[in-house]
Amino acid sequence: MLGKVYIPCAGTARIEGSIGSLIAISLGIDQEATGRENIYIRGSLLGLKKQEIEQKIGQIIELCDLGSFIDLPIRTYSTGMQMRLAFAVSTMIRPDILIMDEWLSVGDESFRSKAESRMVDLVNNAQILIIASHSKELIKNTCNRVIWLEHGKIKMDGTPEDVLTAYFG
């Protein structure tokens, strides 16, 4: 609902601010299009205008480190290359509200450190982070408020320390 994929069954949802989601980061990738073309395709699906994509394309290409492969069809990429491109494009957004399902960690060891730095920057620049996670460390390190949901209902709302203690025992 927060990602505007579903509408409420009852009541209304009022969301103030831009929303970005890091769920399904490969959504919209066209296997026949080049990496460069996919940057524009995926960027537009993320709500970016062509001019915004053009301002960020150099940064995206540098992050995904695909070299001349950027102008080849995605179908010629390894799975790791596809994930690096999808990650680089998906993390070019700067939303007020960031929705994540766990922490993204993609690629080989050298890319992982760049990806980690990008994720920290993205999370730090969001006004609100909504993350679904069972990782005690991740929640402790990124959240200042935790809401424990059970069967769609709020079971507990409080500080990370209080909620994590109740959840994990």
Where are these regions (language model features)?
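ABC ATPase nucleotide-binding domain signature region
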Residues: M1-G43
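Conserved ABC ATPase "signature" region
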Residues: Y40, E52-F69
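H-loop/switch region of ABC-family ATPase nucleotide-binding domains
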Residues: S133-H134
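A short, surface-exposed alpha-helical micro-motif characterized by mixed small hydrophobic
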Residues: I139-N141
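Conserved ABC ATPase "signature" C-loop
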Residues: H151-G152, Y167
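A short, proline-enriched helix->beta-strand linker immediately N-terminal to the Walker B motif
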Residues: T91-M100
